[in-house]
């Protein structure tokens, strides 16, 4: 049933305490609610209280004391009113607030230290359906490579003995009326872990209004965007710097353990302590690092095979008959001009280019393309198994279906409510047809941005053509000979600049569109945002390589009848073919982007951190030498999330798979980059970022489906690359029909200029094409076209069939995990039946135990 949400009044009620908890004579909450008139009603007594609750969250705002003398009244007063209203509503919600100020003559920094009493934690833990432990289990984490090396008796240099390994738990959704069931409930100070406390505080901050909710005046995110507060963050677990080696290892904090055993560069070859990462940063961050480590490990065999294929190409260069014929052809092949103002040239002058092309274009690339297609399929299949194991171990397998709550921004602005068929609760609702309309409108904007990318690509194509003409007219013999390659290389650099600029613009635009679409959950919001940005980035990054791979040199025409684009003659492939140019483009974009990103990730945080510390020290000049924890954490950088990290890796995955036939070294460069990336990201989270709020997740979200789509696209792309952009099939055809040793193959691939062109220039010349003397396609062209199309069909059918077979052969969930899940369901049903029988025998009617894990067998 749909219900319109009341819009006449805007209550600041965060916790409804009007009805006592079933089965528990008194309320466990200790909160208050207030109407707009300011009336307060304090909730009844607590379950218990903690004398000195820890600092759970910090709010910061800066004040320019000099502006008081000449204030810009309107904005300052509005911010002050919003801030005071927000803080008052936090007090009404039951939070403890302590303010600390640091100031000098010019400026002041105000720190609001927030703590949640036991009652508030209990209420929101139940409201948010947080899962809390019922029973401790030994940690059963295992690694297949560690198991294999142990079985073989080989020392494992990858193993790292990390102290304080987090145990596993049976857990279920928290209910305060069943508090005694939960592990550690007798100690209120440690019952809620720091990550759980942060989640609860962030939920309160995200929902608390500071004005009329329907006008969007609610939540800490909006206040940060408006500049009312300059930061909001939970505190780190002390400094990351490690105590001297002589100290006891057990004395290390969680942050110090992560720094010592994970974030240091010297640990690049060690297994990641994922359970420790999950305990400190939450499941979402841990799953990212699990995926990154898994993907990097799988890149190792791909890099080895790719390097072998490339080295094979290096040896084949000097024994390849067509390449040797080209280099020793002297003045045998007089080639037609490459542009309207260019001169005739000798094919032998392109010897170096032909040899470079042979490095990437040989029979080994066919094998490598098949290998990488199956590699990608197996990578995703085994990641599904790894993900299922981690989700079960971290107790988040059903997070999206059952646990996840509506986004605070959605809940505050949704026009009506509806019954959730899974949980049976009334939740905010936005009509799906309205969302679809908004998504269609957003897709129009996406198409416009894609059109901008295509316009940039066309401009790059024209730039290459014009640059080639200009450089070819140079008096320098070297520049003139390499005109095409110079134009291509500089065009790749210009294209990279366009890519980076357009990326920044569209990410901001996609955020606005996704917020407008009103997605119910944070997962749905992130998936929609991710899909928008990825589609744009896919076109942005891959448009130029796709043009070189599949379009360049295809629509050139022939001497005397060349095709043009805006009056400029279409580009031709160089003497070595377009495959070598594609490899160059991939290396410039992929490696260039990786270098730029890594430099940014190293230098930008350092520079920002230095600036932040410099500003902070100026504002607290004369204060104590040892800053308070909240002051030290405020000097760190705000956490920017995982979106850009995932995007970088997924785009890299596309370069590694979609165009791998042109660049077998791509997996090697990706592997080297990722070894750096893992520790770089780890250092950012441990040392340079403020602590993020721990978020739960059950998988890597829509990124997995994007990776699966790229895998399918890679099969088709490599099939067409090998068929139409490589000389592999023409060489095979020639060796079968004419000469097995490929002698004469070079002459076979060159057509003669038509008589009209020859008579106009008083000179005959050759050009790369399968055409007759009149410029028409020869029978050989049509025969090769049929062979190419047949190869594409056979290649993709073989790969897709093999991939489907492997998909069926490898279960998505490991058998051990499947047995554990079934066992838990059985125990849960058994516990429910026993509980009902017990209640029926005693005649007691009460609330049933929370259903989740095998520990539901605990008595009621």
UniProtKB/Swiss-Prot annotation:
Residues 319-362, 463-492, 552-652, 723-779 are extracellular. It is found in: Cell membrane; Endoplasmic reticulum. The gene is Ano7. Residues 1-297, 384-441, 514-530, 674-701, 801-860 are cytoplasmic. Has calcium-dependent phospholipid scramblase activity; scrambles phosphatidylserine, phosphatidylcholine and galactosylceramide. Does not exhibit calcium-activated chloride channel (CaCC) activity. May play a role in cell-cell interactions. Residues 24-50 are annotated as: Disordered. The term 'anoctamin' was coined because these channels are anion selective and have eight (OCT) transmembrane segments. There is some dissatisfaction in the field with the Ano nomenclature because it is not certain that all the members of this family are anion channels or have the 8-transmembrane topology. Glycans are attached at residues 747, 762. Belongs to the anoctamin family. The keyword Transport applies. The chain crosses the membrane at residues 298-318, 363-383, 442-462, 493-513, 531-551, 653-673, 702-722, 780-800. It comes from Rattus norvegicus (Rat). It is a multi-pass membrane protein. GO terms for biological process: calcium activated galactosylceramide scrambling; calcium activated phosphatidylcholine scrambling; calcium activated phosphatidylserine scrambling; calcium activated phospholipid scrambling; chloride transmembrane transport; establishment of localization in cell. Its main location: membrane. The lineage of its organism: Eukaryota, Metazoa, Chordata, Craniata, Vertebrata. This is Anoctamin-7. InterPro entries: Anoct_dimer (IPR032394), Anoctamin (IPR007632), Anoctamin_TM (IPR049452). It catalyses: a 1,2-diacyl-sn-glycero-3-phospho-L-serine(in) = a 1,2-diacyl-sn-glycero-3-phospho-L-serine(out); a beta-D-galactosyl-(1<->1')-N-acylsphing-4-enine(out) = a beta-D-galactosyl-(1<->1')-N-acylsphing-4-enine(in); a 1,2-diacyl-sn-glycero-3-phosphocholine(in) = a 1,2-diacyl-sn-glycero-3-phosphocholine(out). GO terms for molecular function: chloride channel activity; intracellularly calcium-gated chloride channel activity; phospholipid scramblase activity; protein dimerization activity. Keywords: Cell membrane, Endoplasmic reticulum, Glycoprotein, Lipid transport, Membrane, Transmembrane, Transmembrane helix, Transport. GO terms for cellular component: endoplasmic reticulum; plasma membrane.
């Amino acid at each position: 049933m749909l219900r319109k949400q009341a819009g006449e009044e805007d209550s600041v009620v965060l916790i409804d305490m009007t009805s006592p908890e079933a089965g528990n004579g008194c309320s466990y909450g200790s909160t208050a609610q207030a109407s707009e008139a300011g009336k307060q009603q304090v909730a009844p007594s607590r379950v218990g209280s903690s004398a000195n609750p820890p600092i759970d969250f910090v709010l910061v705002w800066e004040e320019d004391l000099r502006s008081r003398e000449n204030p810009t009244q309107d904005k300052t007063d509005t911010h002050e009113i919003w801030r005071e209203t927000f803080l008052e509503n936090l007090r009404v919600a039951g939070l403890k607030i302590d303010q600390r100020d640091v100031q000098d003559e010019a400026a002041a920094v105000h720190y609001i230290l927030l703590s949640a009493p036991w009652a508030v934690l209990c209420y929101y833990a139940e409201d948010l359906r947080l899962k809390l432990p019922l029973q401790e289990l030994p940690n059963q984490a295992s690694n297949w490579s560690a198991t294999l090396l142990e079985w073989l008796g080989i020392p494992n240099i990858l193993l790292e003995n990390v102290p304080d390994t987090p145990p596993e738990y049976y857990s279920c959704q928290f209910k305060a009326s069943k508090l005694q069931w939960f592990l550690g409930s007798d100690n209120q100070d440690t019952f809620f872990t720091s990550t759980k406390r942060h989640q609860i505080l962030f939920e309160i901050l995200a929902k608390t209004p500071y004005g009329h909710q329907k006008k969007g005046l609610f939540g800490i995110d909006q206040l940060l965007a408006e500049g009312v507060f300059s930061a909001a963050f939970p505190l780190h677990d002390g400094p990351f710097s490690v105590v001297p080696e002589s100290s006891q290892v057990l004395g290390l904090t969680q942050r110090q353990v992560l720094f010592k055993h994970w974030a240091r560069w010297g640990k690049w070859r060690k297994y990641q302590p994922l359970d420790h990462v999950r305990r400190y940063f939450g499941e979402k961050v841990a799953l990212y690092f699990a995926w990154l480590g898994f993907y990097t490990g799988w890149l190792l065999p791909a890099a080895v095979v790719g390097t072998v294929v490339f080295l094979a190409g290096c040896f084949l260069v000097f024994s390849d008959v067509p390449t040797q014929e080209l280099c020793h052809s002297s003045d045998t092949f007089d080639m037609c001009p490459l542009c309207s103002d260019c001169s005739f040239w000798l094919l032998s002058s392109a010897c170096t280019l032909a040899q470079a092309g042979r490095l990437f274009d040989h029979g080994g690339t066919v094998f490598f393309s098949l290998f990488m297609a199956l590699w990608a399929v197996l990578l995703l299949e085994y990641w599904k198994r790894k993900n299922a194991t981690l989700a079960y171990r971290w107790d988040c397998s059903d997070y999206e279906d059952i646990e996840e709550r509506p986004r605070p921004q959605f809940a505050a602005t949704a026009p009506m409510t509806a019954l959730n068929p899974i949980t049976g609760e009334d939740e905010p609702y936005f009509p799906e047809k309205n969302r679809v309309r908004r998504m269609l409108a957003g897709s129009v904007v996406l198409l416009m941005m894609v059109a901008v990318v295509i316009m940039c690509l066309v401009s790059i194509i024209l730039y290459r053509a014009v640059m080639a003409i200009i450089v070819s007219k140079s008096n320098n013999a070297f520049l003139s000979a390499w005109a095409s390659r110079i134009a291509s290389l500089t065009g790749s650099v210009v294209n990279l600049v366009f890519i980076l600029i357009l990326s920044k613009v569209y990410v901001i635009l996609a955020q606005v569109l996704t917020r407008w679409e009103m997605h119910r959950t944070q997962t749905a919001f992130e998936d929609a945002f991710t899909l928008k940005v990825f589609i744009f980035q896919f076109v942005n990054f891959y448009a130029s390589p796709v043009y070189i791979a599949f379009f360049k040199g295809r629509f050139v025409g022939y001497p005397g009848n060349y095709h043009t684009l805006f009056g400029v003659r279409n580009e031709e492939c160089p003497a070595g073919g377009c495959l070598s140019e594609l490899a160059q483009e991939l290396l410039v974009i992929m490696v260039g982007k990786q270098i730029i990103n890594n430099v940014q990730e190293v230098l930008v945080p350092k520079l920002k951190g230095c600036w932040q510390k410099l500003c902070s020290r100026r504002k607290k000049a004369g204060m104590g030498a040892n800053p308070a924890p909240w002051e030290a954490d405020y000097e760190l950088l705000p956490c920017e999330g995982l979106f850009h990290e995932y995007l970088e890796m997924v785009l890299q995955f596309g370069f590694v798979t979609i165009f791998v036939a042109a660049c077998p070294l791509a997996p090697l460069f990706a592997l080297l980059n990722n070894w750096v990336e893992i520790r770089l990201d780890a250092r950012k989270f441990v040392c340079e970022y403020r602590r993020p709020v721990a978020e739960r997740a059950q998988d890597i979200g829509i990124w997995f489906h994007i990776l699966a789509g790229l895998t399918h696209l890679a099969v088709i792309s490599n099939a067409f690359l090998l068929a139409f952009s490589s000389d592999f099939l023409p060489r095979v055809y020639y060796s079968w029909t004419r000469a097995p040793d490929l002698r004469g193959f070079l002459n076979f691939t060159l057509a003669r200029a038509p008589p009209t062109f020859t008579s106009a220039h008083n000179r005959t010349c050759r050009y790369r094409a399968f055409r007759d003397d009149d410029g028409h396609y020869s029978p050989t062209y049509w025969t090769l076209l049929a062979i190419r199309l047949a190869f594409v069909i056979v290649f993709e059918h073989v790969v897709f069939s093999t991939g489907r077979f492997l998909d069926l052969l490898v279960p998505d969930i490991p058998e051990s995990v499947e047995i554990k899940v079934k066992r838990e369901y059985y125990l849960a049903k058994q516990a429910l039946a026993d509980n009902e029988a017990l209640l029926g025998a005693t005649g007691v009617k009460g609330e049933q135990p929370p259903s989740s894990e095998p520990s539901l067998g605990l008595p009621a």
